[in-house]
Amino acid sequence: SGVAQVAAHPGYVPGYALSAEMIRHDTALLKLAAPIPSAVAAPFVLAVEGRAGQEVSVVSYGRGREAALSWQRACGVTAAGQGLLALDCDVTFGSSGAPVFTGEHGRARIVSVISSGNTSGGPPIAYGMALPDLVEDLKAQLRREAGPATATARRVKVGQGGGASGAKFAKP
């Protein structure tokens, strides 16, 4: 029922000119107020950092295709390094934030998120960021800003449970 917490990388400043530094940090992590049941949406695992020559796919809503999800099944990482990925994926305005997937171990994994792209004349090019270290930093930021966990009382009776508390109770 909404977003409980947001962590945005301090290296990203909205409204500034596009640069490698901006693309590298163009990610935020949202902590939801309530978990999404796995029966509704299965979570995706992050892929190991992207590499040049890697085949990827992009799922997005972009300008002119807002009503239907677009899936480019085959495009690739053309360059990777210094926390950045260049892709030959066909993205358009509005595709920012779209996940870039790769298939690893028989499962789709997120390798990047679209930050920007250029389709003006010439072949398509899109840019994303390397996620593993960035996501770890954002998770740490969420933990720091969450504050200490609040203790809650729980009634435990002899002979009941034990598995949830770690303690085992036996009737005398």
Regions found by a protein language model. Give the residues of each.
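Catalytic nucleophile loop of clan PA
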Residues: D90-I114
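Short, solvent-exposed aromatic-acidic interface loops
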Residues: A7-V13, D90-G94, S115-T119
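Chymotrypsin/trypsin-fold serine protease catalytic domain
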Residues: R24-T27, L32-V91, S95, P132
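A short, polar/proline- and glycine-enriched secondary-structure boundary/capping micro-motif
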Residues: L69, S96-V100, G121-I125
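Short, mixed charged/polar active-site loops
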Residues: S1, A68-Q72, A108
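C-terminal cap/linker of serine protease catalytic domains
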Residues: I114-P172
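Conserved catalytic-core segment of clan PA serine endopeptidases
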Residues: S1-I36
